Amino acid sequence: MSNELPAVICLVGPTGAGKTAAALHLAERFAGTVINADSRQVYRDFPIITAQPTAEEQAQCPHRLYGFLETEARMSAGVWGDHATAAIDEALAQGRLPLLVGGTGMYVRALLDGIAAIPAIPRDIHVRWQERCAAEGPQRLHAMLCDIDAEYAARIHPNDRQRVTRALEVHEHTGRTFSEWHRSAMPAPRYRALRIGFAATLDALTPRLAHRIDLMLAAGALDEARRARVHCDDPSAPGWSGIGCAETYAHLVGSLDYEAMRHVWLHNTRAYAKRQLTWFRADTRLTWYAPDDVEGIALGVASFLRGGA
């Protein structure tokens, strides 16, 4: 890829791997702007539950695309890409280094590699699948998706109503799977990207994830969920589908007791981290670092900015 393209640094990896701390270090060292690339951290009502950077962290350098979306609003790779492109171009115009930080690999891939031009889905198809999901539950529809598109189904949570129904709608309307559409996307490079992956094993992550959930609960995750219900009390809303959001909602309405909520939250977080690791390990363009090797990461970024690999 031409060195004349503007440089973008991508910090990706599983949830809880330490991406935020590394991003802050790089932002200070290279005058960076941190741009969210996590599909859950866009929601305004859930800063604690989705582990958004704290106010103190965000005060250290410019942050973009955190907590700007209402709970009932939908986000897609294409819409996020438009927002991210604007944020990247803003940073570049200010002479700052764009740092894309997050665990939603599909978003980063769509931005950097191009996105499939999937036709608009007719409203009747969309409504039918939404009604079916409400009646049968997302897990049953996810099982259907496994038969249709096992590759994509393996990358999303069985309770992710938005992505499960979207994939089924696309298949019904176009006759092609989501995976087929993604593979057909034409590359449209606008940036020269260094893709940094955070190497972590699931066994090493699990105790960190459990501790992080306990910290979230101690910091007021349940109060946060209570306030979110005032704004939107529809558990099928996109914002509530996130891990941690769905479990706290279930606890607040009496479907899960406290310990069950915590157990399910950790189980789902661990399963999500496993899917993220599978996704990112399949991308041979990533350069891998230990999560705490901030100096090594900084040296790699400096080399890249000088025109290295």
From Swiss-Prot:
Residues bound to substrate: 15-20
Start and end residues of each stretch annotated as Interaction with substrate tRNA: 38-41, 162-166
InterPro entries noted in UniProt: Dimethylallyltransferase, IPT, P-loop_NTPase
Domain of life: Bacteria
Residues the record lists as binding ATP: 13-20
Known cofactor(s): Mg(2+)
Record GO terms (molecular function): ATP binding; tRNA dimethylallyltransferase activity
Site features described as Interaction with substrate tRNA, chain residue numbers: 104, 128
Keywords of the record: ATP-binding, Magnesium, Nucleotide-binding, Transferase, tRNA processing
Gene Ontology terms describing biological process: tRNA modification
Known catalytic reactions: adenosine(37) in tRNA + dimethylallyl diphosphate = N(6)-dimethylallyladenosine(37) in tRNA + diphosphate
E.C. designation(s): 2.5.1.75
Positions of transmembrane segments: none
General function of this protein: Catalyzes the transfer of a dimethylallyl group onto the adenine at position 37 in tRNAs that read codons beginning with uridine, leading to the formation of N6-(dimethylallyl)adenosine (i(6)A).
Family: Belongs to the IPP transferase family.
Subunit description: Monomer.
PANTHER family: TRNA DIMETHYLALLYLTRANSFERASE (PTHR11088:SF60)
Protein name, as recorded: tRNA dimethylallyltransferase
Biological source species: Nitratidesulfovibrio vulgaris (strain ATCC 29579 / DSM 644 / CCUG 34227 / NCIMB 8303 / VKM B-1760 / Hildenborough)
